[in-house]
Structure formats: structure tokens, C-alpha cells
Design a protein with these regions (language model features):
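Short glycine/proline- and charge-enriched loop/turn segments
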Residues: 74-80, 123-129
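Short acidic-hydrophobic, aromatic-tinged amphipathic segments that line or gate anion-handling sites
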Residues: 131-137
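Conserved N-terminal substructure of TIR/SEFIR domains
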Residues: 1-71, 75-79, 85-90, 94-99, ...
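Short amphipathic alpha-helical segments
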Residues: 4-6, 127-130
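Conserved beta-strand/loop subsegment of P-loop NTPase cores
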Residues: 103-106
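Glycine-rich, charge-decorated loop segments at or immediately adjacent to ligand/cofactor-binding or catalytic sites
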Residues: 112-124
């Protein structure tokens, strides 16, 4: 059985470069821990939803990168993507919460924490989760805090404690 993993959830147009950098750093810092990020982890021809659900079954941490346009990103018809039941970011976070995966919101580049009334009903809990901030100017400091938080969850899971 593979060790518990870390899942990186993000919007490509919002925090894509941060997600890529974070995945690289997670892989370096935790070489024996699987790190799931859609572009690198889903094989060609594989069903996205199934791959995401499978990954979340083995993850103990989901890092939700929330950038300045995370809440307001729209689809081609101008509808807010978070209101689309088929939105993958919504699916990832909702599924993680349903499976009691630790969700760590990371507010990127000055993004504000979403308020409950801004979120779909099944994501309201996200507004109550303590978030970390991450910015370009303080990246090393912010990233070290995030890595320490992830390490604590991984260690508590290895010790058999609840996340």
C-alpha cells in the first residue's frame, strides 16, 4: 500500500505557476510521499473524475491554492465556475472534505479568504478553515510554514492519529 499522499488543488489561470513550484518542492521535501497534481498525475486517456477520486482516497492532505480570481473565475458562458457542479476544483475540495482529508487553504498573492456566503453550500466549511498566506515576496517563509503544516499532518497520520 502506498504511503499517504498530498493533493494540490488549484485553478490553472489563477495559481498555476505556484502549483507547479509547490509540487516540485513537495516532491523534494517529501521524496517518499506521492504528490498529486492533475497535469503530472493523470495519464492520457484516463477519466479525470475517477483519477481525482482515486488520488483523494490515498491522500491525507489537500492544499487548496486560492488566488485573487479563484472565486470569480468564469466559464465560456460567463457563469462562475464554482457554481458549476462539474467544476473540478469544487469536486476536489468537496470530495476531500467528505473523506475527512485535511484541507489547507493557501491564500496566494493577496487573495482574501472566501466568506461562507460566497461559496456553494457544500463548501461553506472552507470559509471556517484556518488559511496560510503565500506571496512572491515572502515565498520561502510562507512555503516553509506550509511544509511544516503538511509534515505535521503526515506524521500524525503515520502515528495513527486523526487528521
Amino acid at each position: 500500500m502506498p504511503p499517504p499522499g498530498v493533493f494540490v488543488s488549484y485553478r490553472r489561470e489563477d495559481t498555476g505557476p505556484y502549483a507547479r513550484l509547490l509540487k516540485e518542492h513537495l516532491t523534494e521535501r517529501f521524496p517518499n510521499v506521492p504528490v498529486f497534481m492533475d497535469l503530472d498525475s493523470i495519464e492520457v486517456g484516463v477519466d479525470f473524475a475517477e483519477a481525482i477520486e482515486d488520488a483523494l482516497c490515498s491522500c491525507v492532505v489537500l492544499v487548496a491554492l486560492i488566488g485573487p480570481v479563484w472565486l470569480t473565475t468564469t466559464d465560456d458562458e460567463g457563469r462562475r465556475r464554482l457554481d458549476d457542479p462539474d467544476d473540478y476544483v469544487l469536486f476536489e475540495i468537496r470530495t476531500a472534505m467528505e473523506r475527512c482529508v485535511r484541507v489547507i487553504p493557501v491564500l496566494v498573492d493577496g487573495a482574501k479568504a472566501p466568506r461562507q456566503q460566497q461559496l456553494p453550500a457544500h463548501l461553506c466549511k472552507l470559509a471556517r478553515l484556518n488559511a496560510l498566506e503565500m506571496s512572491y515576496g515572502r515565498f520561502e517563509y510562507d512555503e516553509s510554514r506550509l511544509m511544516a503544516a503538511i509534515r505535521r499532518v503526515l506524521e500524525s497520520t503515520a502515528d495513527g492519529k486523526s487528521t
